[in-house]
Amino acid sequence: MASKRILKELKDLQKDPPTSCSAGPVAEDMFHWQATLMGPSDSPYAGGVFLVTIHFPPDYPFKPPKVALKTKVFHPNINSNGSICLDILKEQWSPALTISKVLLSICSLLTDPNPDDPLVPEIAHMYKTDRAKYESTARSWTQKYAMG
């Protein structure tokens, strides 16, 4: 079941890729993908290229994929291990969701962080109390880690 569904999503992605994202399997392993996200132009991550790893569980799509950011990013909902705090990757997952929708959700999280459900409380606090400092730090991290 899982491999058929993953194959279908891959075909759909190749036919109609989401804006500013690309994804596909690593080598021959259909359960392990790598994706690339372009930093949204209306965010401090603009110009950055962010690598994402995707691991599909054997019971996909009934369980969410494990998705992690490989590129270091300064963000209240993404920690230094690349874990992403996004409801659809946890309790809000639904088999109707696709990798394409997940990637678009990560892009919108880059544009609109959720400081009320942070993975990194210090960054969330800065986002709420000193937006200019947050944006300049996020920009400098993007230049340092995502534009190499």
From Swiss-Prot:
GO terms for molecular function: ATP binding; ubiquitin conjugating enzyme activity; ubiquitin-protein transferase activity. GO terms for biological process: protein polyubiquitination; protein ubiquitination; ubiquitin-dependent protein catabolic process. It comes from the Eukaryota. It is an enzyme of class 2 (transferase). GO terms for cellular component: nucleus. The keyword Nucleotide-binding applies. Induction: By N-acetylchitooligosaccharide elicitor. The active site is at 85 (glycyl thioester intermediate). Its EC number is 2.3.2.23. Belongs to the ubiquitin-conjugating enzyme family. E2 conjugating enzyme that associates with the E3 ubiquitin-protein ligase EL5 to mediate ubiquitination of target proteins. This is Ubiquitin-conjugating enzyme E2 5B. It comes from Oryza sativa subsp. japonica. The lineage of its organism: Eukaryota, Viridiplantae, Streptophyta, Embryophyta, Tracheophyta.
